[in-house]
């Protein structure tokens, strides 16, 4: 179901799981100029927002939503760079209150995307430096993994495109060069302009996915709270 031009909602019906999942996926052309900004933006999204301005506040709120799990992921697929924001939460049939949790999760999705913690036209500097250090430490740990190291070396032999050959040292330097302002600018750019591929994926359990019921669900669950603008063709 299309929310606006270029942004669609995809419903996947399944009875296999005890949880529901909502995933927002941004797809951008792979670029050396934005790869570090995308990675740091993804890290910042799951750290805090204006309603929950510290990591502790956000984790406490997630715990109050019956242990909802929130995660981000940033990865390459072909010549595209993909940023994902995922929420996994318990199905209604296991709760005493019905038809409440999904709306609360969607409000949190909205806050996460449209109300990050911003200081002087950039991400909060203190939070940003913490996330940058953690990202660099994670990359360094990956390079100590022999399988990951071998995979990166194989990339250098297999690909001719420098975007796909990206070495650890180059990526590390690009991350070090990022500032709260440059990463926030990158975040605003992909939020406004990048295409949405499978942008909102809702894994539905015990829900009949007909056109009428999907339309009703979109209205009830407040998907219209997202202020998305149309993408160009």
Label each residue range with its predicted role.
Residues 59, 115-139:
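Acidic/histidine-enriched alpha-helical segments
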Residues 12, 18-31, 36, 58-111, ...:
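M16 family metallopeptidases and their MPP-like homologs
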Residues 48-51, 93-96, 115-124:
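Short, polar/flexible loop-turn hinges at active-site or ligand-entry regions and domain interfaces
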Residues 1-65, 171, 184-233:
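His/Glu-rich zincin catalytic helix
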Residues 45-49, 113-117, 139, 143:
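Sec/Tat-exported extracytoplasmic proteins
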Residues 41, 105-113, 210:
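Short amphipathic C-terminal alpha-helix that caps PH/PH-like domains
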Residues 136-193:
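Scaffold signal of the M16-like zinc-metallopeptidase fold and its non-catalytic homologs
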């Amino acid at each position: 179901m299309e929310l606006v031009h270029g942004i669609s909602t995809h419903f996947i019906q399944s009875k296999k799981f005890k949880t529901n999942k909502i995933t927002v996926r941004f797809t951008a052309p792979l670029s050396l100029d934005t790869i570090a900004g995308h990675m740091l933006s993804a890290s910042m999204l799951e750290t805090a927002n204006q309603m929950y301005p510290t990591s502790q506040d956000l984790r406490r709120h997630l715990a109050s939503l019956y242990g909802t799990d929130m995660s981000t992921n940033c990865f390459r697929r072909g010549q595209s760079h993909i940023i994902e924001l995922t929420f996994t939460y318990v199905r209604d049939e296991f709760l005493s209150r019905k038809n409440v949790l999904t709306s609360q999760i969607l409000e949190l999705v909205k806050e996460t995307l449209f109300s990050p913690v911003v200081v002087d036209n950039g991400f909060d500097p203190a939070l940003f430096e913490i996330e940058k250090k953690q990202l660099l430490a994670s990359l360094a740990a990956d390079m100590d993994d022999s399988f990951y190291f071998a995979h990166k070396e194989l990339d250098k032999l297999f690909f001719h495109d420098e975007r796909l050959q990206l070495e650890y040292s180059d990526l590390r330097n690009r991350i070090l060069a990022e500032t709260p302002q440059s990463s926030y600018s990158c975040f605003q750019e992909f939020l406004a302009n990048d295409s949405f591929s499978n942008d909102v994926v809702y894994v539905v359990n015990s829900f009949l996915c007909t056109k009428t019921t999907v339309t009703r669900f979109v209205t009830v669950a407040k998907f219209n709270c997202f202020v998305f603008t149309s993408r160009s063709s």
